[in-house]
């Protein structure tokens, strides 16, 4: 019975995410939220931006369906997602982005119980490393499924590993994976959407 209820919840969440992504595309098209390719891009045509916002929708839906179990982590994720989406639609100074990234990393450390300022050097190194990893995604071209494919290659093994050694609520991993699958459905289809900052930095 519980398994059936879980499957029903997953189905509802998947449907909501799909509708949310389609609605976002209409908004992006209406307000001209687009990416014009440059020399670093692997695509050659103007493409809609910001479809990776579905990842943020997924995090919100997880909290709505399964409870606010990881408040600091989710808050940090939303902060990064919000500033990254702003980067898609307007110019944001790098220092402001870094401030948000550092604050989000502090929230992540707080969530997992590592925010102990007696070990400030560990925290400093961790923040710099994690922020660097986040921004590596920024150098991936968000079209043709590159970032989404890499992200699935991380999330799926995490789900399998979590079955053996429970370190996080499996529902969070499953909901986020569904978000990526929906994004990839559009992202692998060229010309429809480009991921860009919202997904890249939130991931």
Residue ranges and their predicted role:
Residues 2-203:
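"…together with the soluble PPM/PP2C metallo-phosphatase catalytic core" -> "…together
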């Amino acid at each position: 019975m519980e398994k059936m209820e879980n499957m029903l919840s997953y189905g509802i969440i998947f449907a909501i995410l799909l509708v949310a992504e389609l609605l976002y595309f209409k908004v992006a098209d209406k307000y001209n939220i687009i990416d014009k390719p440059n020399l670093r891009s692997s695509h050659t045509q103007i493409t809609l931006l910001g479809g990776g916002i579905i990842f943020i929708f997924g995090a919100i839906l997880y909290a709505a369906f399964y409870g606010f179990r990881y408040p600091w982590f989710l808050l940090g994720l939303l902060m990064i997602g919000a500033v990254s989406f702003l980067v898609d639609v307007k110019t944001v100074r790098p220092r402001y982005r870094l401030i948000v990234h550092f604050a989000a990393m502090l929230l992540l450390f707080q969530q997992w119980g590592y925010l102990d300022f007696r070990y400030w050097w560990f925290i400093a190194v961790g923040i710099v490393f994690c922020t660097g990893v986040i921004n590596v995604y920024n150098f991936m071209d968000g079209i043709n499924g590159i970032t989404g494919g890499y992200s699935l290659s991380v999330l799926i093994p995490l789900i399998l590993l979590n079955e053996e050694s429970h370190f996080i609520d499996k529902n969070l991993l499953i909901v986020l994976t569904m978000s990526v699958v929906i994004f990839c459905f559009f992202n692998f289809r060229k010309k429809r959407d480009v991921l860009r900052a919202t997904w890249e930095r939130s991931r």
